[in-house]
A protein has these predicted regions:
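Canonical Radical SAM [4Fe-4S] cluster-binding loop centered on the CxxxCxxC motif
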Residues: 1-28
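N-terminal [4Fe-4S]-dependent radical SAM core
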Residues: 1-3, 34-41
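Alpha-helical scaffold elements adjacent to nucleotide-binding pockets in ATP/GTP-utilizing enzyme cores
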Residues: 29, 33, 63-64
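Conserved AdoMet/S-adenosylmethionine-binding subsite of the radical SAM
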Residues: 38-45, 50-195
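Conserved small/polar residues in nucleotide/adenosyl-binding loops
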Residues: 198-205
């Protein structure tokens, strides 16, 4: 589900960022992406991981989440919904405190300098600050915290990165989702091979 038309974050690996930002979606426009599906009654989960940065349009996103989870709306369990974000600090804290949906952080590198190259938002909202903020909340029960990690060939796919990930996330009740990269035009990034995935998984468990 998308939260914006376009996106301001300009992550190197994302095609949406190359298109620039046009507008925020309203709560009704966000909900309509679900309601207009012929299969909507068969949906089991919704992920806010489409176009846009949800925390950059948080007022409307929270309204949409309320409609999805409230008894007067769709009455879905918050456990059926995951919000994915680069981690805008102010919005992140508000999101955590105002609803109970699952949270997924786009990580992609445990190293600040490298993450800044992949995700310019790191320069304003560092991953280390986010981790320290997240440690103030309990993710050991119903609510799930995960970190998304696209594995790039020769960039973040070595055992060194697995160790840095463990160091960064130590003390958090979370999971790391390893994601395959699908190439986009004009970007000098390549997806890692299966061996790299296996090595990373072995060090994370």
């Amino acid at each position: 589900v998308s939260s914006q038309v376009g996106c301001k974050m300009n992550c190197k690996f994302c095609m949406t960022g190359k298109q620039g930002y046009t507008a925020n979606l309203t709560a009704s426009q966000i909900i309509n992406q679900i309601h207009s599906l012929p299969e909507r009654d068969k949906l089991t989960n919704v992920v806010m991981m489409g176009m846009g940065e949800p925390l950059d349009n948080l007022d409307e996103v929270l309204k949409a989440l309320e409609l999805l989870t409230a008894n007067y709306g769709y009455a879905w369990s918050p456990k059926r919904i995951t919000l994915s974000t680069v981690g805008l600090r102010k919005g992140l804290q508000r999101f955590i405190e105002e609803n109970d949906c699952h949270l997924a952080i786009s990580l992609h590198s445990p190293l600040t300098a490298q993450r800044s190259e992949l995700m310019p938002a790191e320069r304003a909202y560092s991953i280390t600050e986010m981790v320290e903020l997240l440690k103030n909340y309990d993710f050991s029960k119903q609510r799930r915290l995960s970190f998304e990690y696209i594995v790039f060939k020769g960039l973040n796919d070595s055992q060194v990165y697995a160790k840095e990930l463990l160091k960064l996330l130590r003390g958090l009740d979370c999971r790391v989702n390893l994601i395959r990269f699908h190439a986009i035009p004009g970007v000098d990034l390549e997806g890692a091979d299966t061996v790299s995935y296996t090595h990373l998984r072995a060090h994370e468990t």
